[in-house]
Amino acid sequence: LYQNIATSNSRFFSYAEMIDASWKNATMFFDESQILIAKYLSYRNEEITKEDLKAFIHKFCKDKSRDILGIIGDELSSYSCSLLKEMEINLFRKMSRMHELELKKHILPDKDLRDNVETAIKSALYMNYRRMYNDEHIIQNHPQLHNALFLFIRNYAYSGMFRYSKKGDFNVPYGGIAYNNKLMRKKLDYYQSIPLIEHFKKSHIYNCDFEDFLRKTQPTENDF
């Protein structure tokens, strides 16, 4: 990641900007999909069953497949894309969980209802990118994309956690409602700013034993 930023790698920044744009696209997709809210209200009011809701979401994702894939665009969807599957899973899981909580506690206010459905959409997008980040083909053959995905995950993973499974896959879930309106635009602008680039030109990062580091760099009292 450091090397891509320090060298102003255009391919890396192109991928990072595509990913950031997709987050805004997901917001627009939610705004244009208010039928999801209406259908959940039908489920809440017992006008439809849980199986009816599941069937509706399946059909919704199938009918809207072009729009759903349009969230990430042609290039990103050409890789190991699981967005359609994740959208269906996350929408149904979130709505089912919302209904369970409403039965146990209280009816969600309209804003909370909207925020939760938007979170399901954003979680689906996050899960798609997490799967791409773990994809061995991308790791081995598309380092700039992999680093852009790393940057995204660092910004949107729950509590900024970084955790891997025994298989070596990153497995932290999406951060949730508080992350829905978060964008990387300011960071990307900063990472491409002249002062930062000039600073990086004079910087070196080492990953080694501290004793080896001291031998290699031979710091003086003026370095501290």
Question: Could you tell me what each predicted segment is?
Answer:
Residues 15-16, 24-224:
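SAM-dependent nucleic-acid methyltransferase catalytic core
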